[in-house]
């Protein structure tokens, strides 16, 4: 299956986007196997990556071969793909519209969510950025994704996976924190002309 990706962009972002787009298209078309796969991914959201062999297989299909781990622990790319896939499954549950929306950053979607609700919800977003472990970040991300699902606000899961790799790395984490902060602020603070009265 990896051979078909040789002529395409083989980045984590494109591979996660491709896999989620396929799942999303099949789910929205009512394909039973896609519903089953999303249910399995949802069940795995709080599990350690690799515990469920089918979910781990789906995760590994989304990780470019050159970025697969070699130790007994998942690496940054594997954790990012696993997190993106399982959170997407939570996000899409019960929705008949796409929750994977290419081009919409996670932080922009979250800014829109907070703008539609209450400013005090920004603390949930801040908790993701200030959490000291990836497990804590995953916990706070799940909370936000649940709220985004409730409000029907989607975002780009391929880009999200790429951002999650950088959020785990101490050398690139400050850059992602700044980028997400800017995206959040721009979405939260600036109302597009078509929304003004």
Predicted regions and their residues:
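Domain-length accessory/inserted modules outside core catalytic folds
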Residues: 8-11, 122-126, 136, 184-195
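N-terminal domain-start signal
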Residues: 3-68, 83
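Alpha-helical oligomerization segments
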Residues: 150-197
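Aromatic- and glycine-enriched beta-alpha-beta binding-site module
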Residues: 64-112
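Non-catalytic, well-ordered alpha-helical scaffold segments
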Residues: 35, 39, 53, 57, ...
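Conserved aromatic-histidine-acidic binding/catalytic patches
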Residues: 8, 29, 44-48, 73-77, ...
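Conserved binding-pocket/active-site segment within a compact domain
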Residues: 99-169
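Intrinsically disordered or highly flexible coil/loop and linker segments, enriched in small
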Residues: 29-33, 47-54, 68-69, 94-98, ...
């Amino acid at each position: 299956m990896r051979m078909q990706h040789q002529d395409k962009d083989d980045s984590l972002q494109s591979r996660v986007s491709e896999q989620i787009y396929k799942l999303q298209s099949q789910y929205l078309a009512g394909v039973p196997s896609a519903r089953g796969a999303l249910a399995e991914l949802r069940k795995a959201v709080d599990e350690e990556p690799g515990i469920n062999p089918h979910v781990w297989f789906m995760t590994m299909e989304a990780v470019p071969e050159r970025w697969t781990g070699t130790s007994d622990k998942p690496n940054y790319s594997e954790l990012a793909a696993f997190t993106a896939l399982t959170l997407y499954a939570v996000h899409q549950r019960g929705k008949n519209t796409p929750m994977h929306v290419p081009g919409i950053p996670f932080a922009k979607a979250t800014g829109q969510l907070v703008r539609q609700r209450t400013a005090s919800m920004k603390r949930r977003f801040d908790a993701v950025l200030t959490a000291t472990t990836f497990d804590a970040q995953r916990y706070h991300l799940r909370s936000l994704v649940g709220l985004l699902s409730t409000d029907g606000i989607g975002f780009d899961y391929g880009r999200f996976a790429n951002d999650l790799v950088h959020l785990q790395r101490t050398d690139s984490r400050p850059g992602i924190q700044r980028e997400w902060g800017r995206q959040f602020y721009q979405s939260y603070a600036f109302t597009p002309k078509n929304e003004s009265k």
